[in-house]
């Protein structure tokens, strides 16, 4: 698996699409190319850009331009009626005396599932995504339930699914991994975007795809990993075997912001060292004491909040 490290604004997705173009120029069938991302937004953007750029039908020609987890879910032999739904969670809730959230849709984002589930279900599924014991995760994080309650729900949840031959979202990912030799498609080349955000369980899917692909390229930036809370294993991306390259020119970050950003990333203890050049523009960095001091009525704004405060 060849890694492409892309600092902010260096064009990771564009670089991957240029490589898609090279494959198409060589005569590779579009359906023998997989372009996979962590979020639906990134996957859909790549699909739309590829359809327009290469004059392809997004549904017929680019069916493998999608999220990594949606590919895995679509390739299992689990039928729709076997998937845990709202009615199943309601029935289980009545049996155990604890109200649980209903099941997310199959095209939901993994990070949305982690933030919307009941805290106990969240803990159970996050432990599975991280491939660690539920007790270990419970000991490492805060949850407003005692261990006996968490363990009780965990055991009841497993028994309910087993008894009724039902699967949840994470079960379907595991099913793909367990049967990857049979259910994973074969590709000429696989492109993986946002690789820094994959959990250990998703990395198992990525490695299964690597085995079924003649070539595989994984693009990402460990400095931009924002989904550790959802199980992202950034260190796995950094430690992958194989060659790599770093995109060295940003087309987004001006000089003044680049200087501040470099000071901040220098505080990160475990990272892949990267050098890149800012775009030829000074830009500006301003320190604002209160958000009310900013006129948000014009232009586009990206506001980052820390610890839920804004």
What spans do the regions from the language model cover?
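Short coil/turn segments at beta-strand junctions that form active-site/ligand-binding loops
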Residues: 31-32, 61, 185-189, 214, ...
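Conserved helicase motor core of SF1/SF2 NTP-dependent helicases
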Residues: 7-13, 38-41, 196-282, 302-310
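Conserved interdomain hinge at the start of the Helicase C-terminal
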Residues: 287-299
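Accessory N-terminal region flanking or inserted into the helicase ATPase core
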Residues: 1-10, 14-15, 32-34, 105-191, ...
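A short helix-to-beta-strand connector/capping loop
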Residues: 56-63, 242-243, 280-286
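Short, polar/flexible loop-turn hinges at active-site or ligand-entry regions and domain interfaces
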Residues: 28-32, 53-61, 78-91, 98-104, ...
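P-loop NTPase Walker
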Residues: 1-81, 259-262
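Short, well-ordered alpha-helices that flank and scaffold nucleotide-derived cofactor binding pockets
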Residues: 18-25, 48-52, 174-181, 204-211
